[in-house]
Amino acid sequence: MSKLRVGLLFGGRSGEHEVSISSARAIASALSAGENASKYEILPFYIHKDGRWLAGEAPQQVLKSGAPLLESSNSSPADNNLVNSQQQTLERWQSPSQVAEVDVWFPILHGPNGEDGTIQGLLTLMQTPFVGSGVLGSALGMDKIAMKMAFEQAGLPQVKYKAVTRAQIWSNPCVFPKLCDEIEASLGYPCFVKPANLGSSVGISKVRSRQELEDALDNAANYDRRIIVEAGVVAREVECAVLGNDQPQASTVGEITFNSDFYDYETKYTAGKADLLIPAVIPDEISRQIQDMALQAFAAVDAAGLARVDFFYVEATGEVLINEINTLPGFTATSMYPQLWAYSGIPFPELVDKLVQLAIERHNPSH
């Protein structure tokens, strides 16, 4: 029986390029472990920070070193069939010949152009199965404003928020103060300012005063044209993993504890900065509620394959508020998603195997 050729797609043109490499290394290792070694052949594809797709030796080098390629010269023409970005657009989007050899794609591109529906649209056009959500689920899972609207429609409780645009923030001096007045009146302090379309806590600020609010809005506008401001809440941060397509399963619930002021990019991806507690020490009925809400959120955005759903548990009142869904969660050594499933009885190699099989199942539905 011939091996299934898995196109491991990583890197990308986003601020989470290095995170993508870390996830890809873990997945490549899992696809080569135990029984998976006899089932799968890995075809790695590395998307350079300049947007070029590289196959052959270049992605192997990145997987081995864990470091991104910094210079175009690091890859020879033999390893890269995609020409320079300075050349014609038509030529630039010629893909490496190995693309045609892929049986199923495993995109592990975090952030914009990776988990926002864009790469999912391309893979859909290729008519090849791929791991994870389709265009709609990915787009809703990436845009925090659209996501919250979907949650609201599904009746899921969440923190108060206000959506603003870059145009409002960078408008004339008369409009911006009024915008800040509205935010102060409706949300108060502390509150969180977030770019709508960036993952891994990039560009997020916790603000406690008018000056901090103004600075945070200006900073977030550098990252995105859509910004969301959320009311702060005193709560424990808990997470639940979801696995499946139309009949998904929810994992046990985990909790994130950290000493920093909030769960920012550095805290998330630096060993020792945050602790993952699995299972979370919370009442059983709260765990069941979180699992049920995670499945509702998964359906609300039309997710598929996998997702991690984040919640606030307000211990003082017993209230559970949904924070967000991540349709392509990290697969690094410190990532919550694979650890939640490991505790729930699905070790990492088996989890990766299930995700590949779910991709094929979704592409080829049967009665």
UniProtKB/Swiss-Prot annotation:
Keyword Cytoplasm: yes
This enzyme's EC code(s): 6.3.2.4
Binding positions for Mg(2+) 2 per the UniProt entry: E324, N326
Domain of life: Bacteria
First-tier enzyme category under EC: ligase
Pfam family, one: Dala_Dala_lig_N
GO cellular component, one term: cytosol
Keyword Cytoplasm appears in the UniProt entry: yes
Database matches in InterPro entries: ATP-grasp, ATP_grasp_subdomain_1, D-Ala_lig_Van_CS, D_ala_D_ala, Dala_Dala_lig_C, Dala_Dala_lig_N, PreATP-grasp_dom_sf
Residue span, ATP-grasp domain: 148-357
Binding site for Mg(2+) 1: D310, E324
Gene3D superfamilies membership: 3.40.50.20, ATP-grasp fold, A domain (3.30.1490.20), ATP-grasp fold, B domain (3.30.470.20)
GO molecular function: ATP binding; D-alanine-D-alanine ligase activity; metal ion binding
Compartment(s) where it occurs, according to its Swiss-Prot or TrEMBL record: Cytoplasm
Family, similarity comment: Belongs to the D-alanine--D-alanine ligase family.
Known function: Cell wall formation.
Protein name: D-alanine--D-alanine ligase
Organism whose genome encodes this protein: Trichormus variabilis (strain ATCC 29413 / PCC 7937)
Gene: ddl
